[in-house]
């Protein structure tokens, strides 16, 4: 048997199993998340990290073997390798040199998995029209698995709450709560579509109720506000699909309205209240301190001042403000100095602004960026720049060092700073390609693409981008970004494969021949 013959048979065997392979890969995700949680508990998380990288390598090898366009994979990999080389050069040229190449490489590999997985899933979708059904079924089984793991965590008394200190919110076993809550929102639209296709109304009502109740009790704002978005979108596209059974609309509408009416009893509202009380307590300390400080004109110091007012204060007053900043933004003050941090906060003395974690991380990243040279801004700075070894001294004079990580939660700013102008442009262009496929497809083939299936895929895509920007932990967390990869490949299949949509079709709109 020749090598070509053996390869041909191997490729056919692998291609025939493509649907099952995608299904198995999706089912593996919640299992890996649980294993990762327990590995962290037992301080052996490196094992699961290696397992995910091994899975990534195997998936890419599988997709490469069955692909008819291997050159695309090679070009894609070569482009990213060139970018990584340029990024490393920028890190070496940066002040202080390349501090932690290993940690930086790990962050890079986590970030680039999404586009690579997308390429692999596109290959899988192109090989079989049954893959979309496997994806829908995979999302359903994933939700079932996640719910069973949640129940098991409570049965064993090992559950983790969404908000640990307040002990509220159903989370189960999860390392990164933002990612887990995002995943739960991601899978619901296609689950509802999959069950709807079965034409079993009672099963659909039950599934919708369970999914939305789960999102309600998880307790994150992401999941809570996903309920009306998904519910209203489902109702709208059922209308588009000319569904005649009014029970679908009544049931979905009733569940959404019930969740909205019960906001005051929700975990989200409880957490907002607890946060407000906590902020009031902390603000009282600042207010008590500010009562002793007055402007040169004798007026009490407001919660926002300007540089001129600050410069006019006596040394004792400046020292009190310094102590406030050291208390609530100590690592930032140690890294950049008090005056610069005070200026970045626009001379604020409001505790809600000083202690907002996302805002702290954004300001920290911005200051690191401002200190970077042009080469670094082109290709991004390294991950270790977001880490501070914060030194403190207790009342007995004993010094301790705590590692504080300011890694950005919001994905797009993180990619901008870590990837620079070039990396960010590549990432945005990659996502924009699929968005343009949707736009061109709707303009040129509206009736064929404006369907319930396309609508649920589109809603999932919009949710993913919104959550990546405003909540984060999607694009740079492989356990969440793999779902985005699936949806991007699904979009490609709906448009470029099934309807033969091409970006250049947009120019045909202005031509006399509009046969698409």
Write out the residue ranges for each language-model feature.
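A membrane-periplasm/extracellular boundary helix in multi-pass inner-membrane enzymes
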Residues: 241-349, 370-372
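N-terminal signal-anchor transmembrane segment
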Residues: 1-65, 86-94
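Loop-to-helix entry and N-terminal half of a specific, functionally important transmembrane alpha helix
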Residues: 22-26, 209, 410, 433-470
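Aromatic-anchored transmembrane helix interface
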Residues: 48-55, 76-89, 98-124, 137, ...
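Helix-loop-helix junctions and helix-breaking kinks within/between transmembrane helices
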Residues: 36-48, 205-243, 258-274, 287, ...
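Long extracytoplasmic/lumenal interhelical loops at the membrane interface
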Residues: 328-419
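Transmembrane alpha-helices of multi-pass inner-membrane enzymes
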Residues: 231, 430, 437, 456-516
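Alpha-helical transmembrane segments of multi-pass inner-membrane proteins
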Residues: 133-160, 175-241, 259-269
